[in-house]
Structure formats: C-alpha cells, structure tokens
Amino acid sequence: IDPHGTARALMQADLQQDLRVDSGKPLVFHQLIQVADNRWYWYQRYHHLLVDGFSFPAITRQIANIYCAWLRGEPTPASPFTPFADVVEEYQQYRESEAWQRDAAFWAEQRRQLPPPASLSPAPLPGRSASADILRLKLEFTDGEFRQLATQLSGVQRTDLALALTALWLGRLCNRMDYAAGFIFMRRLGSAALTATGPVLNVLPLGIHIAAQETLPQLATRLAAQLKKMRRHQRYDAEQIVRDSGRAAGEEPLFGPVLNIKVFDYQLDIPGVQTQTHTLATGPVNDLELALFPDEHGDLSI
C-alpha cells in the first residue's frame, strides 16, 4: 500500500466532485490524512466565493497560531481578520469618490490602446464561461536553471523575469507579438481588505507588446513599469471597463489567458514541525491561467 498515493487520490477525488455552490457540498472542507507515524497531509479546500489566493495562507497561519497557543496552554488568540462588511463599505465609498473617476478615465484610455486578446483555443472567446473542469499541468525549471538565469541577470527582479519569460512563451505559442492577457491583482494594499479573508482579487487587461530588438531584461523592466502604473488603478472592476465601452460584460472579452504571480508566504511556524505547501487547484478558469510560483530557493514552477 502506498499511503502517499492513497492520500493524493483521496484529495483528487474530492476536488473532482461537483463543487458548485448549489451542489449541496460544503463550501469549506478540511481533512487530516496520516501517512506515517510522524507525517500528515492537511488538506484544505474552499470555494472561491469565500476566499482567494491571499486568504489561504492567512487563514492557515491563524489556525497554526491557535494550535501553538493551545500547545502552550494559552488562551485562543483573537482573530486578526477584518469583517468583510468593512471591505464592502469601503468599496461602496470608492464607487462615489474622485478616485473612481480617475480610474475610469485611466482604463478607458488603456482600453483604446489594448491589442486583441490572445487564446490558444480555436473556440471564440465571446460567450465562454469560467469552468471548474480544468486540465492542470505543472512545469518546473530543472537543476536550478531559473535561479542561474536570475543570477546572470542580477539587475532584474525574479518575479519580473518570470513574467517576461512567460509573456514571450505565450506570444510564441499564439504566434503573436502583440496581444492582451489578464493579470491578477490582489486589490488589498492600503485597504481594509489587507486584513480580510474574503475574495477581492481583480483580473485586469495587460497589453503585451514584444519588440524583436528588445532584450529579455528590457522586456522584464518594461512590463514591470506597466504593472506599476496599473497597480495604482487596480480597484476598478474589469467588468466595468467593458460596460464603460457600451458592451455587456462577457460580450467582448478583454483578454484570454490570465497571468498570476503567486508570491505568498506559505511558511508555518509550528515548533517541531516541518511544513511544505502544495497547491492542488485554483479557482475557475475561462481560457488559460498561467500561475507563476517563484519559491524561497530562487526556483520557479508554472
């Protein structure tokens, strides 16, 4: 009997169920699976209506904090999380603010300059709906190749380099030098959402232009500058960008593939316990999501 294989099969079987909101299945599910005397899998599954990628490690750390406090015989730590109602109230205030108007103007201009969306699928993008029926493939650089490349290009941030490589790769797959992709923003910094667990992420259109004469560091630096500018306006909903142009959301997709850089802190501080986080699934996908995982050792997986 392979206890690790059995545990992974249990988790995959759970993920492959009909887990839509109206399925009757629990929206939150935790399971401890013992595979050896001193080794366990702590399986966690949440519906995306409840959490996003930022929330997972935050909730896990709080559970670990409670566990450690109980081990020491201490009272249960107070919750560090902001009620989600505060996030909703803050967003409603934003909708009535000058910042909303500035963001609307910024995205209207971005929309005018945006190249057509790319897709690897022959099916048309309009009319598609996000699905949880997802084909997942994990790609990893071997033997520290990404770490070596990042060392050679020391003037470029690792996350910027990872994004530039992925943008080039996607352009090559689509045979496109100019295309629009989605980029996931957390929409939390400077907001009540920074200490809330509900889902607030926003997927916004990123125009990618690949210049034949440009070097990889130059592309990485330019994309980073684009994202920095977009980040100032990340609270504005992508659906609203489409509505502002007189179309219905979903009628005219702004992008196909979505790029997602995941740099969350997955480390848990539990005395006497070594932990490692494995991401088994993400939220629903409309076309293609490329999730980039730079790790603490300087390597990269997609």
Segments from the language model and where they lie:
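Short amphipathic alpha-helices and their capping loops
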Residues: 1-9, 13, 24-26, 61, ...
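Acyl-thioester-dependent condensation/acyltransferase catalytic cores
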Residues: 1-44, 109, 116, 131-144, ...
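Active-site-proximal acidic secondary-structure segment that organizes catalysis
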Residues: 33-85
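His-Asp-centered acyl/peptidyl-transfer active-site segments
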Residues: 38-39, 92-104, 132, 151-166, ...
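C-terminal lobe/hinge of AMP-binding adenylation domains
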Residues: 45-47, 264, 295-297
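Extended, hydrophobic beta-loop-alpha segments that form or line the acyl/peptidyl-thioester binding
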Residues: 54-63, 177-184, 200, 211-219, ...
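A short N-terminal helical cap/helix-turn-helix that marks the beginning
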Residues: 63-82, 110, 117, 230-242, ...
